[in-house]
Amino acid sequence: MSAILSADDLNDFISPGLACIKPVENFPQKNTASEENAYEVTTEDKIQPENQAPTQISLTDCLACSGCVTSAEAVLISLQSHAEVLNTLDAHRPAPLIITQDGNLSVSRKIEPDERIFVASVSPQVRASLAATYDISERKAGHMIDQLLRGPQGLRNGGKHGNGFTWVLDTNVLRQMVLTLAAQEVTEALHTSSASSGSGKYTSPKKPILSSACPGWICYAEKTHPHVLPHLSRLKSPQALSGTFVKSILSRTLGIAPSQIWHLAVMPCFDKKLEASREELTDAAWSNISDSPVRDVDCVITSRELLMLASSRNISLPSLPLKSLAPTYAPHFPDPTVDSFLFSHTQTSKQSSKYGTSGGYLYYILLLHKEKHPGSRIEVQRGRNSDVIEYSLMSETNEAIMKAARYYGFRNIQNLVRKMKPARASRLPGANRRGAAGSGASSSGLDYAFVEVMACPGGCTNGGGQIRLDDAREANASLHSATPNDSAVTTQKHTTYEQRQWLSRVDEAYFSAESDSEDEAKPAATGSSLHDMEIRTRDILQYWTNLTGAQLEDLVYTTFRKVESDVGKDKNVNDTTRVAELAGKIGGGW
């Protein structure tokens, strides 16, 4: 464990402060009804209290402030949860979609403002968690989620309007876009200087490039280690990219506003709710006609909340048909080219444990560069623990072509960012020379071309929103007749060994995802298949930009910012005076 790691760093959530430091300057205006008599005198004891609207601080405000919230999981559960999904399904009428027997979709009339099209994106880690819970294959877990979200025996079987999700997407498909662009980003960094390059708001990252798909890591970096921000990859995560992809294409092909498309993401991590609430991830980034920004991902729920979603509608997940839906409930995407990309089983390749449980960014980049250097080999060296692994791509002559690393867990992340921290310039005479001599050790992390960084130890299959062992026991116990002994089993505490065994089951389900698919007869991905996927992905990226008329950078890139707190700092007297004047105008004061 790092010597500077304190107990406070082990839990990065701080309860919201009693007094939010964000000033509220839009005070409600006093209601002066026309029937009131201006000359009437009312004694103080007869004055009726005014029902003023409560002050609201949005999650976007919290993300722009480091005063009280550093990990908003507890707050987000009430803002983005299974209850919000059900309330939204009941609050809006279904869009007038006509789906034929063969799955072709058309719109019968103009979609009204109060009507919605519902789309969901599901991560492979969620399917793995569900597969381990009910002891089924990852493929059947996908069918289970499909049947729940858009099948006739799922959410459509209840609610005010009988709403369900029209499309359920696999984020693995969008992940292939991110992998292709990440490999390109690293290649460009290897052939340029260490300084940031590029123009506009999307500046190319410096080496070592740090992955930016983990929102817990991003929140931590923005608030505590701004010196690593120039190293963060510009790419959106698969979740964010799926929201942009769905809303930009559907709004264009169906001629509707992005606000009429409601996008749900089912993820393994509570911090993904933070990511969905970022002001950078709205249609304002890629749409020129957006007056009021609409989030690309409207709601995020976790694997555990998926169980709660089914329980709220009294739906037994194991009782659902574990098979593909009929075309009437699984329509084609309006655009044939996009439909082929989203729902083709040949888009993603089989991944081994070498890829890791967080999308395989690092190993994919290594394989592509290995393909460019015939005869090269990948050497693996374990770090101080199992969550730190260093990789070296070596040539035939035993020369290092590139180095990369994997850092999982905040304990290891702190060691990484400490290595990358720039050395302070000393004022002592002759100190600069000694500092330069020792700069290699302090900047050893800069030898990497790419670092895959994830906040959770073990990767995304161990996300905070995944189904726990006791949750799985309770879910399975509810399938049988409850007895006193059974209830005792579900409430007993599990050991560390049992927890590790449970995580191993989830990992096994994750890595066996493709082995039980319809294409299991196909061999594992080779260099040529990786090259083919690269070509298909670049073709669909070009098609996407042509279809929407947006720049590719605006569709796939995002930005990050340094978050500073005003707590403990001298406040601007002018601002304080202005707020006091506003308070005085409504009869208040300090």
From Swiss-Prot:
Residues binding [4Fe-4S] cluster 2: C214, C269, C456, C460
SUPFAM superfamilies cross-referenced by the UniProt entry: Fe-only hydrogenase
Pfam families reported in the protein's UniProt record: Fe_hyd_lg_C
Keyword Protease among record annotations: no
Keywords associated with the record: 4Fe-4S, Iron, Iron-sulfur, Metal-binding
Any one Gene Ontology BP term: iron-sulfur cluster assembly
Gene Ontology molecular function, alphabetical: 4 iron, 4 sulfur cluster binding; iron-sulfur cluster binding; metal ion binding
Function: Component of the cytosolic Fe/S protein assembly machinery. Required for maturation of extramitochondrial Fe/S proteins. May play a role in the transfer of pre-assembled Fe/S clusters to target apoproteins.
Protein family (similarity comment): Belongs to the NARF family.
Protein name per the record: Cytosolic Fe-S cluster assembly factor nar1
Organism from which the protein derives: Talaromyces marneffei (strain ATCC 18224 / CBS 334.59 / QM 7333)
